[in-house]
């Protein structure tokens, strides 16, 4: 069993990241080499888009806010939660004073960021069971949402165990030692990473995250992921 744990936590991580990076580069090259569309979907008279307006449309979804305010709330919560989650993972690797404007220990939010993401994903998932979204959905949409839900669930369980259940066998130092050893290409698994009471949550979290990175491009999931809502 320890051999399986090691494969998931070390070689599979390198494989998943390698596949994801390679897939990203291939997709970028295809986009750059692809033919440019001679026409656009803009309505005449065409107005030149300003970069501030483009950023506003990209990050704040004004059209969704006007037509589907409830969906907009969950979209904002989901995307803000993802940013905070990304920062939290960075803080497991490095001490980043920039993010300590509000003093906190990783992760920011005391466990509620993960809870917010889980509720948002459930909203996106159940929304796909109703018309007209159901008719526009494909199985891949459900698979991605369920996979993301499980990744965040097991990751949040590790945070909740430490914060809410006072079950801190896997410490922040253990996580940091594990991540930094991977980045340095000198992988070393702390004892608690595979032998503590809730090490299975770390292993499942990493295993599912690996699957997500590996299959992200094989199932043409870039578009599906960006249109989860």
Predicted features along the sequence, with ranges:
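Membrane-embedded alpha-helical bundles of multi-pass integral membrane proteins
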Residues: 2-229
């Amino acid at each position: 069993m320890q051999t399986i744990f090691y494969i998931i936590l070390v070689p599979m991580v390198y494989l998943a990241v390698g596949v994801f990076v390679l897939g990203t580069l291939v997709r970028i090259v295809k986009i750059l080499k692809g033919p440019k569309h001679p026409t656009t979907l803009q309505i005449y008279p065409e107005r030149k888009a300003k970069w501030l307006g483009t950023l506003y449309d990209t990050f704040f979804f004004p059209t969704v806010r006007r037509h589907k305010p409830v969906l907009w709330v969950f979209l904002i919560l989901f995307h803000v939660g993802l940013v905070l989650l990304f920062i939290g993972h960075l803080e497991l690797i490095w001490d980043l004073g920039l993010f300590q404007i509000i003093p906190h220990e990783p992760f920011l939010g005391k466990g509620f960021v993960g809870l917010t993401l889980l509720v948002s994903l459930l909203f996106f998932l159940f929304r796909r069971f109703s018309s007209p979204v159901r008719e526009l959905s494909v199985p891949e949409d459900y698979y991605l949402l369920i996979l993301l839900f499980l990744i965040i669930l097991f990751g949040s369980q590790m945070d909740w165990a430490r914060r809410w259940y006072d079950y801190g066998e896997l410490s922040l130092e253990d996580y940091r030692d594990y991540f930094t050893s991977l980045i340095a290409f000198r992988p070393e698994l702390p004892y608690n990473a595979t032998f503590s009471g809730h090490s299975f949550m770390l292993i499942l979290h990493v295993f599912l995250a690996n699957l997500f990175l590996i299959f992200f491009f094989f199932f043409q999931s870039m578009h599906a992921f960006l249109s989860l809502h």
